[in-house]
Amino acid sequence: MTEVKKGRVVDDAPVNDAPENDAAEVTSPARHDAIPEEARQRAAQLRADLERHNRLYYELDTPEISDAEYDVLYRELVGLERRWPALRDEASPTQRVGGEVLEGLEKQAHTLRMYSLDNAFSRDEWGAFMQRMYNALPDAPSAFWCDPKMDGLALEVIYENGVFTSALTRGNGEVGEVVTAAMRTVRNLPLALRGDDVPRRIEVRGEVVIAKADFEQLNARQSAAGGKLFANPRNAAAGSVRQLDTTVTAGRPLQFLAYGVGQVVLEGGTAPWTTHSGLMARLREWGFDTPPEGRLCASPDEVWAYYEALGARRESLAIEIDGVVAKLDDTEAQEALGFTARAPRWALALKFPAMQARTRLDDIRVQVGRTGVLTPVAILEPVRVGGVEVSRATLHNEDEIRAKGLMLGDMVLVQRAGDVIPEVVRPLVEERTGDERPFVFPENCPECDSPVVRPQGEVAHRCVNVMCPAVRRQSIIHFVSKAGLDVRGVGERWVQQLVDGGHVTSPVGLFSLTKLDLMRFERMGPTSAANFVTALDAARTGATLVRLICALGIRHVGEQTARTLAANFTDLDALREADAETLQQLPDIGPEVAGSIRTFFANEGNLELLERLRAIGLWPKRQDAPPAPEGADAIVRPLQGLKVLFTGSLTRVGRTEAEDMARAAGANIASSVTKSLDLLVVGGKPGSKLEKARKLGIRVMEEADFFAMLESAEMPAEGSDAAEVPAPSVEDVDAKEVPSRDVAHVRIVHDGTASDPGGDSRSVAEDAPARSTEGDAVSTAEGEDVPRGRAEQLKLF
């Protein structure tokens, strides 16, 4: 359903935080204070952490933290950006939907971007949302369409002349994975729409789910066949749709539940609905199943009553849900309210409290990570929480164990907020028998028996033995993991087996393995061994500097910091020579991060590893940018500090590669056309972004001139001969090619005229005014007044 998945940001700006474009309503005497360095560093670290957890959750289906922990990190970042607005960045998880599309399936752009909803966790937050809505639109109607917030895989199915033609996963909101063949096997998905009034083209958005009873049967079949059990229905649904072998998908009990539409192209006439409830009725007439329990609520109080009633019955429902989605039913009011940069101002996800269960804390085991951090893990008597069997939960550190007062043998309360990773909430002290025992944190590493230390100011205990087998094992696993070099086809279990067996003692050792070496292992046949070696060789020759820096596992250096370093230094030699002062001149790098980088390169063992990597040819250079001078000059780039945006079809390279080249030249990549944009680079059929940039007086550069500028490392002066692109007329662009609009996620097109219909809140489009009636002006999502005029396309929700 909506992209508000289990409290993940991309989707979940807390409702009591003002939306981006309402920032002026929030006043604080300290808004313009100088930003302390520690605040800048903390914001950068939070962004990196949130982006990583977004990727683990949305793309890899392997979350490492609970929703509650994620929400704490997210709200902390929101608070920092509110306290110091200059910290706010368009690439921040608080400003955009996160996540990148996985490799392995064909990728395709959504006609209209799929956005998300803000959320609320209490009645006060629901009331604050309503107050903001009525402040913005005093005469807003009070009826809301409400339905359950399902926990599945969001995607879009497309119909041409009533016939199913394609399907895309949500992906990163702009580009999804093509899963047409898999979706054809979903039994309740109509392959042809019913009725005579079907649109010429329609994009229907919804959620793929597996019912609880079907999930239990699926896992029973998996167990009987000796297969891997699924953690929860969401993971099973997501994995089933992404199968390349559609016979596997066909054997899975998937359902598609429609909740809204994207682009709608009509032959003529007027829009077929003017409310969201009307849209839902029309979807059912066309043959779609819609979320169960959906209903129209006449007032905000009725919405809350619906939320409480549904929450009380959630365990008895056929599918897993974790909240309620409430949307203003009237589409004209929706358009008047508009959007922030991330979400509609007229819709909200009301989240249920975490589900809880009682169980016994049997033991606490301590694990050692790749940086030597000792992490205590609760070993629980297995218990079902939210449809999933829970037997382990991280306790993070010794301080948390003490703060919660946990003892071995305690009965404890465990919760799982729709996530895979559970949390021990508290001990049930009233049930203690006297047989419980205190837990003593080990003074020696459980893997190598070396003394552990707790550095001053830190909560973590660390094993400082660089030869610790656990540290070595986890470091090598990290090196080839998706968070490191991202070696496809080399699984963690194989790496662990190779390390534990003494066959590999460093990351370099993996690259020296031969097919014959690997075939000595049980279940490693000729084909698997060949694929293993091929994958490693492809990673070695195709590695980027960003991925290698990530793979090294330098403390405090996540992917965002790695991108910054890779954009400003030619290779690891140049980075090694940079002193702390030079490093701190780079964005988001403060004394702590700079010190960590210098410490890494001062270690003899690390330097030996780097030389061995160089010897096997794993030594990438910075891509598509001139060599970096030494010292402080290393941060000077032709696009240094400029905000750049690409639009239209690029012919020389793909969009992602072009953005990487711009970053390497010092640019920050923007997500939309705003007054703060410095440069718009246009390819073929640029559409409305070009028109908007011209209105705002933003510099425009053709694709060829942009790449010529990068190659010469010289930024053309203002008013130079860089040609601008003529603006296309409406007649030159068909309904599929006209870019999406800021205030809408549904576009209805018929015979060059527009009508005034409705749609769904879970997706928003880019780059156009909110409404299109003659005569007056309207505010865009960026807060600018744009004259109203004849609409070539109409927006629905």
Swiss-Prot record:
Zn(2+) binds at C445, C448, C463, C468. Its EC number is 6.5.1.2. Residues 1-11, 733-750, 785-797 have a biased composition (Basic and acidic residues). GO terms for molecular function: DNA binding; DNA ligase (NAD+) activity; metal ion binding. Signal peptide: none annotated. GO terms for cellular component: cytosol. It comes from the Bacteria. Residues 1-32, 715-797 are annotated as: Disordered. Residues 634-723 form the BRCT domain. It catalyses: NAD(+) + (deoxyribonucleotide)n-3'-hydroxyl + 5'-phospho-(deoxyribonucleotide)m = (deoxyribonucleotide)n+m + AMP + beta-nicotinamide D-nucleotide. Belongs to the NAD-dependent DNA ligase family. LigA subfamily. This is DNA ligase 2. It comes from Nitratidesulfovibrio vulgaris (strain DP4).
